[in-house]
């Protein structure tokens, strides 16, 4: 699928030394707008203070994007404080207020209707977060040496309409093989759940897998559990399943994410200046899972989200391929040509993928 993204960053805004950023990402079904302001030296010992405002729209409601049908509008603002604990690592604490509005669509699955019936369709949540990050990368873009990793715990606080948490880890390592060839290993893990009166992770906070920055060779967000098609009365008066045109169960995401991979970075032949180019052969692997697949029931008592697999490495999707990233004045242009090696049932493949504004 086509993903367009761009950002403008000024590291010394009006000579103050503060950082201002404006970001925009658009795809067929999602738009994200973000404004950020960071004072990197709020105190003399390097404590930073940041603010951000964001607006996101995700609309699977009317589009044929092979994902369970719904739309969510999110508006929020946050503040964060960062503490350096060494030259390469820091702790970050944040607090965000976020308003979410859910809209159901023509092919909305039972799990979404069930959640909306329990919790309503509009939520104001206050999220507190704590994170640790470390980086020894030699470059911010198209790095070739070093490593980076981060761990973040985010949870809603008392006074929120919903009670849930998410724990995420990201890491990557660059290991030079020769002067021009580099091995890169990367992984991303995530787990979320509800607590208190909220049963499970809210569906719109689910993890998804497939596509760029995930498992290339598969359509965006189409790996993992499938939803339960709703039943209703058709134009003939008969009760039947409300499904899309091909009657396939639609991807619903999950509360567990496992993905990673390895790639060999090498120079593109016959190109003298390689500073703005990255070429690789890669192996991607990953999937999302529902840890409560056999526990959740719909309002009619039937099993919810029956189209899901046990959390197991044997149930991971995988692909191999080649990728190219070219950093231009408009932002990074990334291309991937991938072939699925292990394809889960109902997974949607996409051999060629293109992105503007993202790197892998």
Regions found by a protein language model. Give the residues of each.
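Gram-negative/organellar outer-membrane beta-barrel architecture
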Residues: 1-148, 164, 183, 213-217, ...
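C-terminal outer-membrane beta-barrel translocator/porin domains of Gram-negative envelope proteins
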Residues: 1-2, 106-309, 346, 353-359
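Gly/Ser/Thr-rich helix-start
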Residues: 16, 218, 287, 322-324
